[in-house]
């Protein structure tokens, strides 16, 4: 049964895309706590989505590490909250 989490990152990327600002990450994880879908929403509006069909792009990739549920236990969200974010379009420039 998938579980869903939302995590605010208060640090910027520290790479050539640092100007995107801070971000909010959303995770759907499997029974072993590995991400199966992941969304990154940046302060500038940029949205990155990763899953098994799109595991990486020029900006990042689907995490290959299991989430530490001790660290994420207070960050669980409902499936519909995750799905709403997953379906949001990329803002137009």
Locations of regions flagged by a protein language model:
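Short, hydrophobic/aromatic-rich segments at coil-to-beta transitions
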Residues: 1-4, 24
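Short, compact, well-ordered microdomains
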Residues: 60-93
């Amino acid at each position: 049964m998938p579980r869903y989490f939302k995590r605010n990152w208060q640090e910027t990327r520290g790479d050539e895309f640092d100007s995107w600002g801070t971000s909010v990450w959303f995770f759907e994880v499997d029974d072993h706590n590995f991400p199966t879908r992941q969304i990154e929403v940046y302060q500038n509006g940029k949205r990155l989505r990763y899953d098994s069909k799109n595991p990486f792009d020029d900006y990042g990739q689907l995490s290959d590490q299991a989430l530490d549920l001790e660290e994420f236990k207070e960050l669980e969200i409902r499936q519909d909250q995750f799905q709403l974010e997953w379906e949001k379009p990329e803002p137009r420039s």
